[in-house]
Amino acid sequence: LKEQFPDINAFNQEFGLDYWSNRVNKWEDFPDIRGTINQSLAAEFQKFQRKLVTDFLSWQASIVKEYKRPDQFITQNFDYAWTDHSIGYQPEVDQYDAACCMTVAGCDIYHPSRDKLTGAEITVCGNISRSLKKDNYLVLETEAQGNIDWLPYPGQLRLQAYSHIANGSNSVMYWHWHSIHNAIESYWKGVLSHDFSENETYQEACVIGNEWKRIGSHLKNIKKTNHVAVLLDNASLTGLSHFPLATTARHSYNLVMRSLCDALYRLNIEFDMVSSRERNFSSYECLIVPALYSAPEDLLYALESYVKDGGHLITTYRSAFSDEHLKI
């Protein structure tokens, strides 16, 4: 904040700290923001935390780059916002920034199965991963037998595997090989159960592997040229977690985003994800902007220019409410 605001009075003004006598007169008096009533401060601290993740991963990657062979790559398992399965954009990491130091993006995608399998989680989460490097990605973890009530019907494991590949993944790796015998994931079942015996999940994984031995060269590096994109924004995700919709609480942003993405999926309209740090959207015929609660002026101007140049913009309620510091 000191780097952003050399004048502490400007900082107080931007963050509305005269309210309820929260004014900070010296940086040395800066308060602990835990439990703050000022959501602008809380959001700024969460932004700082996301930067710490980016800096840490970049530091790790720089060490690995010193020693890795030219044919080796660097990846990272980026996960997603979570209810009882993967639902959308991760609030605690700016994945677009953090992925810059990676060679290839990696992810884990977990979702309901059996009668509750929709395919939408594979698509939405996969689209996020594909967008991080604007390239193919790796599914570093996904379910085998999975969580309680997730044991796939015969043929579903294969269906899910091909869905990942069709979305642009170059791998499907299962968590995990055999079911563990202790701790919190004791019943998060792997390919094998606790008895290490062959089962239907193992046999179906063998079918998938044998098929990919034959045709895998035709499945890797599948590319897409989509005409529709959905814009993702960490700041708005954070903002709506502090000022949530009445019916969706802390997952407000992701549930608004998913309502749009799931509709596209049901209509069989393929789409990319794009970061809110981008300013040129001209490669897309339609740009969908869910709940852009927090936005700097230059992003709003970029969206306006996109429309003036012939683009079709779809946005929702709770968009353009506040600036990048949650100031309305």
Model-based region annotation:
Residues 27-30, 58, 70-71, 99-328:
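Carbohydrate-binding surfaces of carbohydrate-active enzymes
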